């Protein structure tokens, strides 16, 4: 399942520490779990990139997502976990934006130094065929033609969305749009993906930061800290928590080693 997601982690996160302890019978936990997140684009480098700074403003201005059939499929403003489960059912999904939503999206992304407007100009060029997939059309129909999406389905999705925005009522997915999408172009689309950073699994340690073997015994002289340790997050990654863990676990591991040296 994870092979169809886009990698967004550090280039150096290659699992070397796990390989180093293979001959020590080290116990590994949660190695079947991976940190995955929605709201992602693919950068020209091929790496996944979170788009949270951009989608927040875009959704407030009437942006929405459609799948490969041109249909909306979920509440785009829902929590990340539920949105990701819905995205997993699609072959592809695209964020559809009018000019205001597109401007808001780019403002959030450029203010976060993720890319520049010069990048956007390049990506929108008709002769650009790399990542990210970002397209522009004078009308929704023209935009759909560039994406090979059924225009009638996308236009129907837009009408249903705008009707709910005008009435300020929740749509079939439970979202009450804060604003309608403009009926006048241009319109923009960005292909969205699920990204993953790293495994949520790793080495099994005890309270003294010692690595355990498969018999749950401490391996003499072997300590671990940071992302190489498994089990901190359970089966769901909680955003930004690993920063604190990196500091705290490193501190505890160093203190544990110093205590042994001092004996």
List PLM regions with ranges.
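Short, small/polar residue-rich loop motifs at catalytic or cofactor-binding pockets
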Residues: 58-60, 197-199, 239
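Short, glycine-/Ser/Thr-/acidic-enriched flexible segments
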Residues: 69-72, 78-81, 99-103, 195-197, ...
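A glycine-rich dinucleotide-binding beta-alpha-beta segment and adjacent secondary-structure elements
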Residues: 153-236
